Amino acid sequence: AANGNSMALTYSDTLEDLVSINPAVSTKESGEWTKPEVLTSWRTEGKSETVNSVDYASDGRLKVLAFDSAVYDSDIDSDGNVDSKELNATFNSSEIHVYVNGKHTTLTANNVADMAPEVAVNNGKAIVVWQSDTYNLADTDAETLQKDMMGEKKICYSYYDGTDWSAPAYLERGEIKGAQAYDVALSDDGTAMVLATMGSSEEVQERELYSYIVKDGAQKSVNRITCNDAGET
């Protein structure tokens, strides 16, 4: 995830195991990218944690890196075999983290999978959106898990006002589910727009495009942009 002369990435010095993967930031100097600055202060001592995805944005003054982490059984590294229960437990442990100008904050701490953050920054403010599962994946059966994958995921967000992050909240209170893809932009006055393809049906043509407006951390409106038989993805 690049923004101007800086970018964020997942980085490992060794690639020997999942726990060696961390978020990192590299900057461009004289046309060359520097060796990534690896961020490790997010880790919990005694836990095997890894990073799945990162996003990054900056307005020059404010630099925000967002990522999701997961706790996994260290046996996964040793035997290479992962059963569905282990995998679900790993996903279920996923949480959202942010670094603001190098300062770490954990945004979520719950019993559902929070994954794939997207971040926007403008004029000293920021917003992060991510997908959140409806179910506790570790305690659900195969049929419910399939339903979840078909479209039960919701979109959450947290807003940074220049000092603090707001408590995570669902867009549209979670009533519209089935997050397939999403992106976010932030204007100079602190108004954010989230654009998402949503739809809880397993049929692609049932998915539609929605926009959400968030002003100073509070959701103001939701609009259904499409209503047709085409699959907006």
Predicted regions and their residues:
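Extracellular, repeat-based ectodomains that mediate carbohydrate processing or recognition
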Residues: 1-233
